[in-house]
């Protein structure tokens, strides 16, 4: 540990003092170094503390516990289905008398929505960061932040219009895929719809 006014000269000076940002990167490093000796697909369940160096925003924490379920080496829908079912099984045991909603998304579909709305391709990551706040600030808040970032009002209205009309079921996902067919392969939406239908057939859950 460094005392006040002491400064590290190189990265090596503080390499032993780092705090874990998330559980994903260490797992990726472990898998890359040991994949030849691991079962395929490789399944991992991790629970541990992670930290944020930046100043936390309201409602967020500098330190919190993260739980990750990962399946590596399986590119089929089975991995996604198994992970969602594992989550629902855990939630039912933790909260047996409480209803819950599982939220799923697909980055390819989110990108298709951004492209359809007319956002510049190199700006989609920034759009996603704002979209990620929707649970906290609502759809109107997302609209306001996008406009504050200087995006074209036409693109913002088109994008928030899509978000407002999405139906959170397999049929709604397929309908969205057809609407985005000019900028995205509808098969991407069909893939997510199939996952939702399969999970719904096994576990009685609601998607949000």
For each of these PLM feature ranges, what is it?
Residues 98-108, 127, 206-208:
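Short, surface-exposed recognition loops or helix-turn segments adjacent to catalytic cores
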Residues 103-117, 132-138:
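Short, conserved secondary-structure transition motifs
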């Amino acid at each position: 540990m460094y005392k006040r006014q002491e400064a590290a000269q190189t990265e090596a000076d503080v390499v032993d003092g780092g705090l874990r940002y998330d559980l994903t990167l260490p797992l990726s490093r472990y898998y890359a170094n040991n994949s030849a000796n691991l079962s395929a697909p490789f399944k991992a369940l991790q629970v541990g503390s992670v930290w944020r160096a930046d100043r936390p925003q309201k409602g967020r924490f500098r330190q919190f516990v993260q739980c990750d379920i990962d399946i590596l080496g399986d590119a089929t829908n089975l991995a996604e289905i198994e992970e969602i079912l594992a989550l629902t099984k855990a939630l039912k045991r933790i909260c047996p008398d409480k209803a819950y909603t599982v939220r799923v998304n697909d980055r390819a579909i989110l990108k298709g929505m951004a492209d359809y709305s007319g956002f510049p391709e190199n700006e989609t990551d920034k759009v996603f960061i704002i979209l990620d706040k929707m649970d906290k600030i609502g759809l109107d808040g997302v609209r306001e932040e996008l406009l504050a970032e200087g995006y074209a009002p036409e693109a913002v209205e088109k994008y928030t219009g899509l978000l407002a009309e999405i139906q959170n079921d397999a049929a709604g996902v397929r309908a969205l895929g057809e609407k985005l067919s000019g900028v995205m392969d509808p098969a991407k939406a069909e893939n997510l719809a199939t996952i939702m239908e399969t999970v719904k057939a096994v576990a009685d859950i609601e998607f949000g």
